[in-house]
Amino acid sequence: MTGQAEVLAALDAVRDPELDEPVTALGFVSSCTVSDGGTDVQVRLRLPTYFCAPNFAFLMVADAYDAVSAVHGVERTEVLLDDHFASDAINHGVAARAGFEVSFEGEAAGELDTLRRDFVRKAVLAGTDRVCRPLVAGGATPDRLAAMTLGDAPPTPDRERLRERRSELGLPAGDDAPLLVDLTTGGAVGVEALPLHLRRARLTNVNTEANSSVCRGMLQHRYDTRGQGEVEEVR
């Protein structure tokens, strides 16, 4: 029988598109209710502000609906976004499986797919910094970094997260793939281009971490309860 733990585990795969972190860890899941028989699930989501971008919000609600619906034994799924200026449109659109363009008239077709890919690209850059910065601190030279493969990097959660994000973009992600790849061509980043690539990766990661900290702080200020599955920020 499906329980809350299984549903929250499924929601761990749903990410804030901008922050590239699970909605559970961020505290965005305010409640998760499973019926006695395990067939009906209701999830309520919350966000740091009333005016969070509706396209971001729609992505998270729709992804949460898909994740919960895919849990074995679940027959009826309801995912609701609370306390947001576009809650009604988002909740109705997701429940009707209408899509963002139908729910928000006038938005460009395919906008969400483009937005998602843009943020995954940023996640790849941020992940590159998290994997490469310890290597640089340990004395790895530009020549060494340019010659390394993904499998040469230490087997850390950050490396596997980077591998997953690269796979989502169709970029080389096997152990024999270059550690540093061009996001457009998928080819290896050469020694000459490496400093600029690493600077871009570092800037992207710093911005992402700063945004994550701000969002967590705003959420805590807005709500005085912890979310289901929330993980305390590591500083």
Explain the meaning of each model-derived region.
Residues 1-50, 55-235:
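Domain-level signature for proteins that mediate thiol-based redox and metal-cofactor handling
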